[in-house]
Curated annotation (Swiss-Prot):
InterPro entries: Bact_CCA-adding_enz_type3_sf, CCA-adding_enz_C, CCA-adding_enz_firmicutes, NT_sf, PolA_pol_head_dom, PolyA_RNA-bd. This is CCA-adding enzyme. Belongs to the tRNA nucleotidyltransferase/poly(A) polymerase family. Bacterial CCA-adding enzyme type 3 subfamily. One of its GO terms (biological process) is RNA repair. ATP binds at G26, R29, R110, D153, R156, R159, R162. It catalyses: a tRNA precursor + 2 CTP + ATP = a tRNA with a 3' CCA end + 3 diphosphate; a tRNA with a 3' CCA end + 2 CTP + ATP = a tRNA with a 3' CCACCA end + 3 diphosphate. Its EC number is 2.7.7.72. One of its GO terms (molecular function) is ATP binding. CDD domains: NT_ClassII-CCAase.
C-alpha cells in the first residue's frame, strides 16, 4: 500500500474540492493478487480543466480522453475523468467520449471485471462487477456481455489471452466462446498494437497457457504469419518456457519452438524495427552454431557479447538446462579476448599500403581479416611491429 499512500494526496485534494476520486485499473487488481504494482491510475468526477486548476504541476497528455498527468511527490500519475464511450469505429476506438459524474458508468465500460475494481484512499474496495470473485476464481471475465466488449474493441481478445499468460488465470467460458466467435475482428486492429500484446504473452510466466488458449480459441488464425500454424503452436507448448531477460530472447525462443524457417519474413509481418529483426535473427544464427559446438574465441568474437549472452540463455532454455554459470563462462571467455572488435586492432589498411608497393584493392580487407583472426586466436600480439614482422614471416607482404 505504500505506493498508493504516496498518491493518496491527489485523491484527498480532489475530494476537498468536492469531487469523487478513486484508484482504478491494473494497480488495484495487482494489489489484490499481491503482484508487483505498475503504474497507479486515478479516476475522478472532476473534468480535465478542473483537475488542471487544482494541480499546477500537470501535463495535459490526453484531454480528449479526459486524461491529465499530475506530478505529485516527484511521481507522475494519470488522472482521468469518469467517462462513457459512444459507438466504436472499426472495432477499435470509440467515435466519441462523454464525461460523466458516475463511477459506475466509468467502470462498466472497462474490459474485464478484474480491471473494473476501484479503491478509496483508505483501501476500501468498490467492486460493482464481482471483480474480486473473478480474481478468487482466477477467471478472466468481461464486464457485461463479452460479445459487446469484443465488438467495441477487438484488441481486448488479445489482452484476455495475454492475461492468461501473465497472471496464470483462465478464460471464463462465455468470454472464451466470444473470442472463438469474434476472433476475425482482430483483423481490423493495427499490427503494431497486436504485436505489443503478443510480446507480453511471450514474456509471461504462464506463456504455455496463453499459447494453448490461442490455439483453443482459434485466435492464432487471425495473427500475422500464423494463420496455418496450429500444429507449430502446439509444438511450442511442449517446451518449458523460461522468463527471459529480454523480449528479443522470447521471440527467438518462440521462433525456434515453432520451427520458423524464414524468421526475417515472419518478423517483418509483425512490423518490427530493422534493428530488432537483426538482433532476433542474429540470436537464432548463434543458437544454430552453439548447437554444433561450444563457444570458441572466433565464434564468440564474431557474434559479440550482447548477442552471445542472449543466445546462450535461449540455448539453455532449449536444452532445459537453465545453467546460469554458462552465461558467466561466455562472459569470461569474451573478456579474455585480446581484442573485442576490429577498432581495437593496432593496424589499419593505410599501414598495410605503406608497408608494400601494392595498389589498393580487395587484398587489404582480406589481409586485415587474417590479422584479426590471428590476434583473436592468440597467434599474434596486437602490436604494430609484431604484426608487420608476422606478415613478413608469413610472406604476406
Amino acid at each position: 500500500m505504500e505506493r498508493f499512500k504516496k498518491a493518496s494526496s491527489i485523491i484527498e485534494m480532489l475530494k476537498q474540492h468536492g469531487h469523487e476520486a478513486y484508484f482504478v485499473g491494473g494497480s488495484v487488481r495487482d494489489l489484490i493478487i499481491d503482484r508487483p504494482i505498475g503504474d497507479i491510475d486515478i479516476a475522478t468526477s472532476a473534468l480535465p480543466e478542473e483537475v488542471m486548476a487544482i494541480f499546477p504541476r500537470h501535463v495535459p497528455v490526453g484531454l480528449e480522453h479526459g486524461t491529465v498527468i499530475v506530478v505529485e511527490n516527484g511521481e507522475p500519475y494519470e488522472v482521468t475523468t469518469f467517462r462513457t464511450e459512444s459507438e466504436y469505429e472499426d472495432f477499435r476506438r470509440p467515435s466519441s467520449v462523454q464525461f460523466v459524474r458516475s463511477l459506475e458508468e466509468d467502470l462498466k465500460r472497462r474490459d474485464f471485471t478484474m480491471n473494473a475494481i476501484a479503491m478509496t484512499e483508505e483501501g476500501e474496495m468498490v467492486d460493482l462487477f464481482a471483480g474480486k470473485e473473478a480474481i478468487r476464481l482466477k477467471e478472466i471475465t468481461t464486464v457485461g456481455d463479452a460479445a459487446d466488449r469484443f465488438q467495441e474493441d477487438a484488441l481486448r481478445m488479445m489482452r484476455g489471452i495475454r492475461f492468461v499468460s501473465t497472471l496464470g488465470f483462465s478464460l471464463e467460458i462465455k468470454t472464451k466462446q466470444a473470442i472463438e466467435t469474434y476472433g476475425h475482428l482482430l483483423e481490423h486492429i493495427a499490427i503494431e498494437r497486436i504485436t505489443v500484446e503478443f510480446e507480453k504473452l511471450l514474456t509471461g510466466t504462464y506463456c504455455v497457457n496463453g499459447l494453448q488458449e490461442l490455439v483453443e480459441t482459434k485466435l492464432f488464425s487471425h495473427l500475422p504469419y500464423l494463420q496455418m500454424s496450429e500444429e507449430r503452436l502446439l509444438k511450442a507448448t511442449q517446451y518449458k518456457w523460461d522468463s527471459f531477460e529480454t523480449d528479443v530472447e522470447a521471440w527467438a525462443f518462440f521462433l525456434y519452438c515453432i520451427g520458423e524457417e524464414h524468421p526475417s519474413v515472419f518478423l517483418r509481418q509483425w512490423k518490427f524495427s530493422n534493428k530488432k529483426i537483426k538482433d532476433i535473427v542474429a540470436v537464432l544464427l548463434a543458437i544454430r552454431s552453439r548447437k554444433e559446438k561450444e563457444w570458441d574465441t572466433i565464434l564468440l568474437y564474431k557474434t559479440g557479447i550482447r548477442i552471445a549472452e542472449m543466445a546462450e540463455r535461449v540455448y539453455e532454455a532449449i536444452i532445459e538446462s537453465y545453467n546460469s554459470a554458462s552465461v558467466k563462462q561466455v562472459q569470461s571467455l569474451f573478456h579474455a579476448l585480446p581484442i573485442k572488435n576490429r577498432q581495437e586492432m593496432n593496424v589499419t589498411g593505410n599501414d598495410l599500403l605503406s608497408w608494400t608497393d601494392k595498389k589498393p584493392g580487395p587484398w587489404v580487407a582480406e589481409m586485415l581479416q587474417n590479422i584479426e583472426e590471428a590476434i583473436v586466436q592468440g597467434d599474434l600480439v596486437n602490436k604494430k611491429e609484431d604484426i608487420r614482422e608476422w606478415l613478413q614471416r608469413c610472406n604476406l607482404l
